[in-house]
Amino acid sequence: MFAEQFANVRTKSPLIHNITNYVTVNDCANMVLACGASPIMADDAAEVEDITTICGGLNINIGTLNSRTIESMLKAGKKANALGHPVVLDPVGAGASALRTETACRLLDEVRFTVIRGNISEVKTLASGAGTTKGVDADVADKVTEENLDSAVAFAKAFAARTGAVVAITGAIDIVADAHKAYCIRNGHPMMSSITGTGCQLSALTAAFVTANPGHALDAAAAAVCAMGLAGEIAHKRLTALDGNSSYRNYIIDAIYNMTPEQLEKGANYEVR
């Protein structure tokens, strides 16, 4: 099944509008290219509606939030909704500051999102309007573990039902859920946390996958999460004694570029709940 989702990205090569952050914008663009889609990175309010119109999907990331881009995100999101385009939200660091929390919640109120992708702290912040986010990493009390997986899945399904979006909670164990079904994904490698922007890259990748698979947002988002985790595993095997996190970042992008749909199908490690 995930092979089909990935093959559709390669065949259709959707154009993805990214309003993302300046820390990871280059990596996000290269990740979109690596999977077979095409990126546009445009965040000026004067043009975002035009850019969104010519694209197939929209990825909104609040990582380096400022007052100028807030307007751009809202305008692009509403335009994408009017056009029926899928929209992904990455609420980076929601809960770490009042501005981030207020903006993430405002976006959720004013834009219909196809997928919401974040760590457990960020997603809990969206659900409650307040949080205990530690930087842009999940708070230690908010790690998804085997012991609390059932409750985390129930939370993800409930939030998906409330928002109408697929909810992708990523961490050591990833959860991708709609109101009725959840994928619990165990791909990935711990070293992925040593690179800034793997989550941002995943959100851009997710936008490409859901855009190429209309009507199948849950499966497409799960396929993207599996692909990113599998790329982390493949990339780690390439590391030599002299390689560090910069090499690892490049190897992850290379792994997506070289990954076949069949390789994803075989390597995806998940269960359905």
Give the ranges of each region predicted by the language model.
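Active-site cofactor/substrate anionic-group-binding motifs, chiefly glycine-
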Residues: 31-89
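Conserved post-catalytic alpha-helical subdomain immediately downstream of the catalytic base
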Residues: 196, 206-248
